[in-house]
């Protein structure tokens, strides 16, 4: 594993690492840090969680949502770039319980037919479980979206707008408001 500031993380524990971006919890002792080599040996506190998320290219009509998001910005959390292409979005959404999380999926949709001064991306939240559940708790899921292909189609923008269906009161999509979050892109 490599951190955003160039440190190499090593561990005696092994996990299958099939993705590119992970949320990692670990601890280390000062004696396990090599400042010159910029490496540290760590003990994972939990299994690393892959946060790679898909981007679809096509008409937004072909990629609808069936559930709202609670929000994508809350207090000091909000979308941020990890590097020139990886956009990390903290998505808050309604759940029934911890087991319900596995039925939720998140993706960004880029519709190349929609052009303008800013790059507009559409966040889609879907639940694959058809069971009617009372979703009255919310959770957060960090998603890492690789925008390299989108930028190859659109060019690098000055601003990016993420549009999504927001309902901060309940999990009802019909009473959700279409909301946008704008961030500058200065790469």
Indicate where each model-derived feature is located.
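Short helix-loop boundary/capping segments
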Residues: 72-134
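Short, solvent-exposed, Trp/other aromatic-anchored flexible loops in extracytoplasmic proteins
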Residues: 18-20, 127-169
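Hydrophobic residues positioned within well-ordered beta-strands of beta-sheet architectures
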Residues: 24, 88, 121, 143-145, ...
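Short beta-strand elements
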Residues: 170-187
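Solvent-exposed residues in well-ordered beta-strands and their adjoining turns
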Residues: 29, 91-93, 146-150
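Beta-strand/loop nucleic-acid-binding surfaces
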Residues: 2-16
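Surface-exposed beta-loop interaction hotspot
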Residues: 32-89
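Flexible glycine-rich surface loops and low-complexity tracts that mediate binding to linear polymers
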Residues: 12-40
